[in-house]
Swiss-Prot record:
Class of the enzyme per the UniProt entry, highest EC level: oxidoreductase
InterPro entries reported in the protein's UniProt record: Met_Sox_Rdtase_MsrA_dom (IPR002569), Met_Sox_Rdtase_MsrA_sf (IPR036509), MsrA_MetSO_reductase (IPR050162)
Name listed for the protein in its UniProt record: Peptide methionine sulfoxide reductase MsrA
Task of the protein: Has an important function as a repair enzyme for proteins that have been inactivated by oxidation. Catalyzes the reversible oxidation-reduction of methionine sulfoxide in proteins to methionine.
Disulfide bridge positions per record: none
GO CC aspect terms: cytoplasm
Species: Saccharophagus degradans (strain 2-40 / ATCC 43961 / DSM 17024)
Catalysed reactions listed for this entry: L-methionyl-[protein] + [thioredoxin]-disulfide + H2O = L-methionyl-(S)-S-oxide-[protein] + [thioredoxin]-dithiol; [thioredoxin]-disulfide + L-methionine + H2O = L-methionine (S)-S-oxide + [thioredoxin]-dithiol
NCBIfam families: msrA
HAMAP family, sorted: MsrA
Record's keyword terms, sorted: Oxidoreductase
EC number in record: 1.8.4.11
Keyword set includes Oxidoreductase: yes
Record Pfam families: PMSR
Length: 215
């Protein structure tokens, strides 16, 4: 989305009262991952863990994670807002409170959460508030949505490390929200693994040039 055409009100979060009402029935999505063939929906193997990340356009964000060894499956969707079972158009309206996010299901014995955090921080600019590059709106905000206290602690610690690195490079304060994961709503089938289906598709995702330690 061009900033020239973006409406400023899309950068303002709705309240639970003003958000769209949504629907009781989930929207239709894909059954399997287009790249790996793994089932998108749970239940997942018991040795897997999961986290949800928001870092701008979810097409490019998802590709960053499905390429990592140790990641079992990824899916794009909507979370951290109010509207149940939203559509893409509703999320883009700015009236759901949801973020465009990536669900990452991973094997912690093969890839660490610290590694996932490093990819997250390196792949976008977490200081831009309700936007990412030319994409303006609450659905493009930076966020880490955690499923355990351990994930929360690691995310907060990494945020401090990254803030120091960004400050040294002249960037402002990190605006990333780190909160307990809310319900994840799968996006439409069209959006799942979009850049694998459309290799020339556009997604304005860019980092700051930092390299985050993940040891």
């Amino acid at each position: 989305m061009s900033l020239f055409y973006a409406k400023p009100e899309k950068a303002k979060m709705p309240t639970e009262k003003t958000a769209l009402k949504g629907r009781n029935v989930p929207i239709e999505t894909a059954a399997e991952h287009f790249v790996s063939g793994m089932p998108l929906a749970p239940p997942y193997p018991s040795n897997m863990q999961q986290c949800v990340f928001g870092l701008g356009c979810f097409w490019g964000a998802e590709r960053k994670f499905w390429q990592l060894p140790g990641v079992y499956v990824t899916a794009v969707g909507y979370s951290a807002g109010f509207t149940p079972n939203p559509t893409y158009e509703e999320v883009c309206s700015g009236s759901t409170g949801h973020n465009e996010v990536v669900l990452v299901v991973y094997n912690p014995s093969q890839v660490s959460f610290k590694k996932l955090l490093a990819v997250f921080w390196e792949s976008h600019n977490p200081t831009q508030g309700m936007r990412q590059g030319n994409d303006l709106g609450t659905q493009y905000r930076s966020g880490v949505y955690v499923y355990s206290d351990e994930q929360a602690e690691q995310a907060e610690h990494s945020k401090q490390v990254v803030q120091a690195m960004l400050t040294e490079k002249g960037y402002g304060e990190i605006t990333t929200e780190i909160i307990k994961a809310k319900e994840f709503y799968f996006a439409e089938a069209y959006h799942q693994q979009y850049l694998a289906k459309n290799p020339n598709g556009y997604c304005g995702l860019g980092g700051t040039g930092i390299v985050v330690p993940c040891d």
